[in-house]
Amino acid sequence: GTTEAETNLKIAFKLQNLLEQSGSSVILTRSDENAIYDLDAKTLKQKKISDIHNRVKIGNESSADIFVSIHLNKIPQQQYDGWQTFYNAQNQDGQKLAVAIQNNLNKAIQKENNRVAKSIDNIYIVKHVEIPTTIVECGFLSNADEEKKLLEDEYQNRLAWGIYNGIIDYFYQ
């Protein structure tokens, strides 16, 4: 099947393009499918931890205004679908960002989705990046119908457009 990393990157590149066209500077934590772990990380677990720590470091040292982390869900149950944003309850601006993106994804995708932006405290990036941060789960690869959509260029464009409009709303609200 398709890797989550590959699809996330396609959506991120589309979002980067939209943001740069409107005059924003964009910093990606990676520009290919390779994780950004330290070379001394040996085991898969060490590599994952190192990768996440390096993303947090980029977020905190970048002088960026916001941090948006794009993901796809994959769980054993196949019935779940839809997108959802997450934020740190201790960061009000992170919450505003997550809500703005959630609402704009709802408009861009135009599909029934009752999920709302949700606070989450056990995700390292959300806890440790100091600027307003949101995780955007764009959908479920474990749902066959949604996986098909997530691989379509047009659907990825709509996801990027929803995230983009959420970011714009965040800065102008």
Language model region names:
Residues 2-173:
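Active-site-proximal helix/loop segments of hydrolytic enzymes
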